[in-house]
């Protein structure tokens, strides 16, 4: 078995075939979900109107092909979130506008609903503190406290065996984007091995 894994990893490293992963990007309206996905797909920024229907795009990072679903954050569209997470191999990316206190408090409720849901809590969850370049944004430690997630073990390899973390990002300055992509890449390896 060791030899088979070694050859498989060698072929991956050489780029003969790529891993596949599915991510669902959710969060309240105006958190930057569509802007982030556009940046990941095209490498450029563009202004967007609120997302009214699911938007599917693909992008590649390293040797992983990601199929990403950007779902609207308006209250009347949130019922879709659960429908796009069919199994524990789907990575949930929850974006929180770190510069908007009211949005953070409302996001806290949605995040705790995910963490308390028997089905969704089995999927890896990456919270992105977006707009960390904006004046008055909350830093990572502050955001962890405001979202009341300190009691949960953060990290890729936590004792729950379900990757869960918070990374600060800015689509405008690209701060944290590489950290996010590296986390997603490593997460696909963990999912594959579970």
From Swiss-Prot:
<dbReference type="GO" id="GO:0005829">
    <property type="term" value="C:cytosol"/>
</dbReference>
<keyword id="KW-0472">Membrane</keyword>
<keyword id="KW-0460">Magnesium</keyword>
<feature type="binding site">
    <location>
        <position position="30"/>
    </location>
    <ligand>
        <name>GDP</name>
    </ligand>
</feature>
<dbReference type="GO" id="GO:0003924">
    <property type="term" value="F:GTPase activity"/>
</dbReference>
<dbReference type="GO" id="GO:0070971">
    <property type="term" value="C:endoplasmic reticulum exit site"/>
</dbReference>
<feature type="region of interest" description="Mediates recruitment to ER membranes">
    <location>
        <begin position="10"/>
        <end position="14"/>
    </location>
</feature>
<feature type="binding site">
    <location>
        <position position="34"/>
    </location>
    <ligand>
        <name>GDP</name>
    </ligand>
</feature>
<feature type="binding site">
    <location>
        <position position="172"/>
    </location>
    <ligand>
        <name>GTP</name>
    </ligand>
</feature>
<protein>
    <recommendedName>
        <fullName>Small COPII coat GTPase SAR1B</fullName>
        <ecNumber>3.6.5.2</ecNumber>
    </recommendedName>
</protein>
<dbReference type="GO" id="GO:0003400">
    <property type="term" value="P:regulation of COPII vesicle coating"/>
</dbReference>
<dbReference type="GO" id="GO:0005789">
    <property type="term" value="C:endoplasmic reticulum membrane"/>
</dbReference>
<feature type="binding site">
    <location>
        <position position="133"/>
    </location>
    <ligand>
        <name>GTP</name>
    </ligand>
</feature>
<dbReference type="GO" id="GO:0016050">
    <property type="term" value="P:vesicle organization"/>
</dbReference>
<dbReference type="Pfam" id="PF00025">
    <property type="entry name" value="Arf"/>
</dbReference>
<feature type="binding site">
    <location>
        <position position="32"/>
    </location>
    <ligand>
        <name>GDP</name>
    </ligand>
</feature>
<dbReference type="GO" id="GO:0030127">
    <property type="term" value="C:COPII vesicle coat"/>
</dbReference>
<keyword id="KW-0547">Nucleotide-binding</keyword>
<keyword id="KW-0333">Golgi apparatus</keyword>
<feature type="binding site">
    <location>
        <position position="172"/>
    </location>
    <ligand>
        <name>GDP</name>
    </ligand>
</feature>
<dbReference type="GO" id="GO:0006886">
    <property type="term" value="P:intracellular protein transport"/>
</dbReference>
<dbReference type="GO" id="GO:0005525">
    <property type="term" value="F:GTP binding"/>
</dbReference>
<feature type="binding site">
    <location>
        <position position="30"/>
    </location>
    <ligand>
        <name>GTP</name>
    </ligand>
</feature>
<dbReference type="InterPro" id="IPR006689">
    <property type="entry name" value="Small_GTPase_ARF/SAR"/>
</dbReference>
<feature type="short sequence motif" description="STAR; SAR1-N-terminal activation recruitment. Required for the activation and subsequent recruitment to ER membrane">
    <location>
        <begin position="2"/>
        <end position="4"/>
    </location>
</feature>
<comment type="subunit">
    <text>Homodimer; upon association with membrane. Part of the coat protein complex II/COPII, composed of SEC23/24 and SEC13/31 heterodimers, that it helps recruit and assemble on endoplasmic reticulum (ER) membranes at ER exit sites.</text>
</comment>
<feature type="binding site">
    <location>
        <position position="35"/>
    </location>
    <ligand>
        <name>GTP</name>
    </ligand>
</feature>
<feature type="binding site">
    <location>
        <position position="34"/>
    </location>
    <ligand>
        <name>GTP</name>
    </ligand>
</feature>
<feature type="binding site">
    <location>
        <position position="31"/>
    </location>
    <ligand>
        <name>GDP</name>
    </ligand>
</feature>
<dbReference type="GO" id="GO:0032580">
    <property type="term" value="C:Golgi cisterna membrane"/>
</dbReference>
<keyword id="KW-0931">ER-Golgi transport</keyword>
<dbReference type="GO" id="GO:0046872">
    <property type="term" value="F:metal ion binding"/>
</dbReference>
<dbReference type="InterPro" id="IPR027417">
    <property type="entry name" value="P-loop_NTPase"/>
</dbReference>
<feature type="binding site">
    <location>
        <position position="35"/>
    </location>
    <ligand>
        <name>GDP</name>
    </ligand>
</feature>
<feature type="binding site">
    <location>
        <position position="131"/>
    </location>
    <ligand>
        <name>GTP</name>
    </ligand>
</feature>
<dbReference type="InterPro" id="IPR006687">
    <property type="entry name" value="Small_GTPase_SAR1"/>
</dbReference>
<feature type="binding site">
    <location>
        <position position="32"/>
    </location>
    <ligand>
        <name>GTP</name>
    </ligand>
</feature>
<keyword id="KW-0963">Cytoplasm</keyword>
<keyword id="KW-0479">Metal-binding</keyword>
<dbReference type="GO" id="GO:0061024">
    <property type="term" value="P:membrane organization"/>
</dbReference>
<comment type="function">
    <text>Small GTPase that cycles between an active GTP-bound and an inactive GDP-bound state and mainly functions in vesicle-mediated endoplasmic reticulum (ER) to Golgi transport. The active GTP-bound form inserts into the endoplasmic reticulum membrane where it recruits the remainder of the coat protein complex II/COPII. The coat protein complex II assembling and polymerizing on endoplasmic reticulum membrane is responsible for both the sorting of cargos and the deformation and budding of membranes into vesicles destined to the Golgi.</text>
</comment>
<dbReference type="InterPro" id="IPR005225">
    <property type="entry name" value="Small_GTP-bd"/>
</dbReference>
């Amino acid at each position: 078995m060791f030899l088979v894994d070694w050859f498989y990893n060698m072929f991956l490293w050489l780029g003969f075939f790529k891993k596949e992963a599915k991510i669902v990007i959710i969060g309240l309206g105006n958190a930057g979900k569509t802007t982030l996905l556009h940046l990941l797909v095209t490498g450029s920024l563009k202004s967007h109107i609120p997302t009214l229907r699911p938007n599917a795009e693909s992008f590649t990072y390293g040797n992983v092909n990601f199929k990403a679903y950007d779902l609207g954050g308006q209250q009347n569209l949130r019922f879709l979130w659960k429908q796009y997470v069919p199994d524990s191999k789907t990575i949930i990316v929850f974006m929180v506008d770190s510069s908007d206190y009211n949005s953070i408090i409302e996001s806290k409720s949605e995040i705790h609903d995910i963490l308390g849901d028997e089905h969704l809590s089995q999927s890896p969850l990456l919270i992105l503190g977006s707009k960390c370049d904006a004046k008055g944004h909350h830093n990572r430690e502050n955001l962890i406290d405001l979202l009341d997630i300190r009691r949960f073990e953060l990290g890729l390899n936590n004792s729950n065996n379900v990757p869960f973390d918070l990374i600060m990002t800015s689509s405008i300055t690209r701060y944290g984007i590489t950290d996010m992509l590296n986390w997603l890449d490593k997460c696909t390896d963990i999912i594959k091995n579970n």
